[in-house]
Structures are given as structure tokens and as C-alpha cells.
Amino acid sequence: ERDLLVAVTMDHELGHNLGIRHDTGSCSCGGYSCVMSPVISHDISKYFSDCSYIQCWDFIMKENPQCILNKHLRTDTVSTPVSGNELLEAGEECDCGTPGNPCCDAATCKLRPGAQCAEGLCCDQCRFKGAGKICRRARGDNPDDRCTGQSADCPRNRFHA
């Protein structure tokens, strides 16, 4: 039960980081107490309330948090390689889950001869898109993101407030 309490407390604090306030009496999660309850109950809940879902969605739509909305780079994940999981892992040049991919050898997870890339916002027909090509359109105050010509990945947004 202590582990559950720690996990729910972490969920609660993470909820605050996602714009979720403490629940009021009008909020419901189907249990006696919800994760964003202002007090800890002996009946520990693992569920967020209807109010929490609305507040989190509002936060994402209004604040446009890039750390949540940006697609991760394929090389961001460190794990045991698994073919076909759409992640580029240690020892793989490309994710070899799709035999029909013209850029990637499905048997070896290596790029086919002459290919620079197999997927990514800056990959087109097995080649890196040219430097300056738009890979992610502007959102709000953030400018367009552009390919570098050296990678298949669209660079992370460089705008800072």
C-alpha cells in the first residue's frame, strides 16, 4: 500500500505540472477519492476525475507545451532492441519491422546500399531532405522547423521564451 501511495502522490504532483488543480466537490472519478483530491484519503484512488481530464486538455490546447507535443527523436529511447517497434535502437540503422520498406533491409536492420535514411520527417525516398526544407510548420510564436540536410530527424524546436 505504501508503494501505491507514493505512485499516486507522484501522479498528483505531475498533475499540477500539467495544469490540473485540486478537485472540488463537483468532480468525479467513480471512486470515493480521486488523484487530485486536496487531501490524502485512506481509500487511495488511482483515477483522475472528469475535472482533471478537462483541465489537462485545456492546458495542452492553450499552453501548447512543446515537450509534450513534439514527436520524440527515434534515437531518444534506450532499450533492448526489438524489431518493428518504430524505434531506432542500438545496433539498428533502421527499424526493420516492415519488409516492404525500400530503404531498410528487413533481415539486418541496416540501410540498403545508397540509402541515407529509412524514415523521419527529413527523409524522402531514402535520402536526407535538403537543408532549409520545412519539416514542422510554425505554431504560435514558434517558427517553422527546418531540416539540416544532415539527418532524417526534424530538429527540435529552438524557440525559447
Curated annotation (Swiss-Prot):
Binding residues annotated for Zn(2+), in chain numbering: H12, H16, H22
The Peptidase M12B domain, residue ranges: 1-72
Active site residues per record: E13
One Pfam family linked to the record: Disintegrin
Residues cleaved off as propeptide: 73-88
Residue intervals of the Disintegrin domain: 89-161
Domain of life: Eukaryota
Recorded GO MF terms: metal ion binding; metalloendopeptidase activity; toxin activity
Subcellular location: Secreted
Name the UniProt record assigns to this protein: Zinc metalloproteinase/disintegrin
Organism from which the protein derives: Bothrops jararaca
